[in-house]
Amino acid sequence: MSESKNSGENTLSVTPTKTLSLKRPVEAGTVRQSFPHGRSKAVVVEKVKRRPIGPGGDGHPAREAAPTPAPAATVTAPPPAQRPAAPNPTAAPTTPPAAAVPNVPPPAPRAEVAPPSAQPAPAAPTAATPPAQPKAEPVPAPIAAQAAPAPVPPVPAPSAPVPSTSAAPAAPKPAPAPVSQAKPIQTAPVQTAPAAQASASQTTGPRPVAAGPRPATGAAKQATATPQRGAASPAQRPQTGGGQRSGGQQRNQSGGRGGPGRGESGSSRTPTGVVLRSLTDEEREARARALSGARIREEEDRKRAAAEAKAREEREAREREERAAAEARKAEEDARRLQEQEAKRRSEQEAKRRLSGGEPAPAASPSVARKPVMTATAAAPAAAAPSGRAAVTDEEETKRVIRRPGMPTKVIVPPRPTKGAEPKSRGRLTVATATGGEEEERTRSVAAFRRRQQRLRGHVNEVKEKLSREVILPETITIQELANRMSERGVDVIKLLMKQGQMAKITDVIDADTAQLIAEELGHTVKRVAESDVEEGLFDTVDVEEHLVPRPPVVTIMGHVDHGKTSLLDAIRHANVVSGEAGGITQHIGAYQITAPNGSPITFIDTPGHAAFTAMRARGAKVTDIVVLVVAADDGVMPQTAEAVAHARAAGVPIIVAINKIDKPDAKPERIRSELLQYEVQVESLGGDTLEVEVSATKKINLDKLLDLIALQAELLDLKANPDRAAEGTVIEASLDKGRGPVATVLVQRGTLRVGDIIVGGTHWGHVRALIDDKGATRSEAGPSMPVEVLGFSGSPEAGDRVAVVETEARAREITEYRERQRREQAAARGGQARGSLADMMSQLKNAGRKEFPLVIKGDVQGSVEAVVATLEKLNTDEVAARIIHAGVGGITESDITLAQAAGAVVLGFNVRALKEARALAEQQGIEIRYYNIIYNLVDDVKAAMSGLLAPTLREEMLGNAEILEVFNISKVGKVAGCRVTDGRVERGAHVRLIRDNVVVHEGKLSTLKRFKDEVKEVVAGQECGMAFESYQDMRPHDVIECYNVHEIKRSL
């Protein structure tokens, strides 16, 4: 058989006398190859088996396939005489140091043949007495052994063969062969016994002659630099058995290409009877991929083994250090323990000697004292000294003389410390011990530890006294800031609020009263301060008595609606204000000044009598000096009359009762006097102190008498004011005029208001641009008790705000900013409390499903807007409510339309109109604008719209009853109940209620009603019919059917 790499030499020759081999099966496996220092490598092993078909014709004995191990044995042209008997590796001498090469893996997987001069042949053992070698077991060869190395340049062989006795080198321990990329090596016969080797050497006698001059044969290719590696340190040799080494030598001697086992010559090719073929491209690629994968795996295994070895070395070094440290600590502890025992023993001996009165005990020699404690690892701590107590005792008794009767006087000499011994540390830190470099830990005594524990225990049980702090509280403060000022936890403050029924967060704002309660509850003192210090000296400064002069009285006319208040004022002023009022009712508060018959001026304030204008009446009562209570003689005391009495009592002003409309035939003044007694108003005619007068506004009866009573009451009050000071007053009404801007009706109470003064009213300030009196005339100044319209405010102040004149704009700006900030904080505090209180939380849950009617309200004056908002809020119920999106003074603008469009609200204008641009935008967006000049109409329309949002009331109308006699199952219709109408009638489409055993099991509608086979509209009592219900089939005999209609009834507020 022959094999060639050239395509032209692919020839097959078959000899009849040779055996024909089949395809060799291959078995693959993996073995772990170990190396010194804990390194290992995974090697892939392929096991190739040969199965002979016929007996051999070459005379060789039957051989079994035995793969050889991976290490390649060294070959230096062994003679055939030495091949059967392999020398014992243990008896062979090692390679000289000159031929040793470090055990470094070659850079490339190719083997080089060592030159003969670099490998001197040492003396080999006698071939006659080879050691008995056991039969080598088949060992899987690694893949490195199956790959032949790449061809190398031929190495010149020795000129003459070496004799068998001296040329056989000692077989060193094989080293791992490098991985190479060549075709696998054929299986070699395993050396089984010396007898078989001898027969093989006889058969191949002349083969060594041909093996010499052919260095490129299989044996020469496999002869790598193994002698150099074999000469390395023994720790790097793999632990293999003698049988494996013999097998390796046998493979190199007989199995290599061109070797002795091949034939007489490497160049001569004789037919062997085995058919070979060249490898295909797919097989070459597969083998190349397998070899590349093996190299990659080998590289990964090498890196992994290196990392594991490094980690193992570090771990072993760390363990060694830990063991050494533990042994050192144990030795030091033993030395210290022995030292203490020795010191204790000496102290006891010294104490016994003193008690017995004998001689001092001789000091132990240093060697004896240190002998039990001297160790190789702890020599320094072995030097022990007496304990501190014994040393002090010896020092005290050194100079003491013991005199006993019958005993010579002696001076007790304490034992001298051993030379080089160091005194034991007494737990005290000195400069010597601190700088001596001793590493002994300075321990604390048990007594010191107990004292520390008692001290700590005493601090724990000590009752800390609570500190009382002075807490400065502003008008509003957050919970966090309050807790910080009290040095308390915020959680404790929140707990106190929860006890009071308020759910609050630590960032919520609370008012000063709540903060004061919390601070006092926690044991602190409170000092209330406010930012209102900026307003000090602004109002209520005391005037000098000499500067006071009489001023006109301010009279407020109050009473029920339609009792003639404005008519009475018109009769006094000789004017006709009633004719210009919408609906004949007063909806604004008016201020006028007239001259009495005696020449003294009197200021009148006309208030609305409608129930919606309660706030106006309250403001009028606050700024007035006298209240004129107008009561119609034909109508009696009404609710607003009683309310006016209450306002006057709250303001503390006197009341003059004016019984109006006495000219009517049904007038009953005496009934008015008796009815006022129910409200604790007792007139003079009934023995009281309240002045009364019967008047008629239309007939102008007793008007002068009324004015005289007003002058008398003012004289009794002794009304005075200082006109030569900064003006103070009250805003009675405020509005936003299109041409004049913000306009405020101010009643000057003290001082004199002049044009150009800097005034502050509420959250707005400005320069007085103009002063207009009640007759429309422009005035340069206004004295006490004079009502004027003031122009020049930066915005519309609210009705009821106090007005004062300040010196500079900076002061005015500071005051207004403080008031604005205060208003925001108070609103936030109210909102936070509203969110947190339990009652408001329940109210929010109750109003969760309530429908809302959004509104945008614009009015002519501030008082009218307040009245409209208050009236609409009274219409709210649990089901529907009017939600005021925005309420303001002035005409309807584009911003109002945009706000209404975003909220889906209706715009209501009270005595105002919309601008042209606002009307165009409202038409474009589809926003409804409604105008009103009478508050009755506005309230009625809103009430009707809110009533439409209420769910209607459902009322049932019973029609009749029927009883099911039988249930029929119709294929296309379903189940149909055959019924008899017991009373009333049954209508198709009506509501039905199915009752079974007095329990309602279904409510629905009657979908089908038939009389025989005809569809009918209704069936009266006593007749039978068929019924079918919508989406219900579970009908049973003897069920009762109630038929009824449902009517919806609209609701109203």
Curated annotation (Swiss-Prot):
Pfam families the record matches: EF-G_D2, GTP_EFTU, GTP_EFTU_D2, IF-2, IF2_assoc, IF2_N
Name by which UniProt lists this protein: Translation initiation factor IF-2
Basic and acidic residues biased stretches: 279-288, 295-353
Keywords associated with the record: Cytoplasm, GTP-binding, Initiation factor, Nucleotide-binding, Protein biosynthesis
GO molecular function: GTP binding; GTPase activity; guanosine tetraphosphate binding; translation initiation factor activity
UniProt lineage: Bacteria, Pseudomonadati, Pseudomonadota, Alphaproteobacteria, Hyphomicrobiales
Skewed-composition ranges (Polar residues): 1-20
Record-listed GTP binding positions: 559-566, 606-610, 660-663
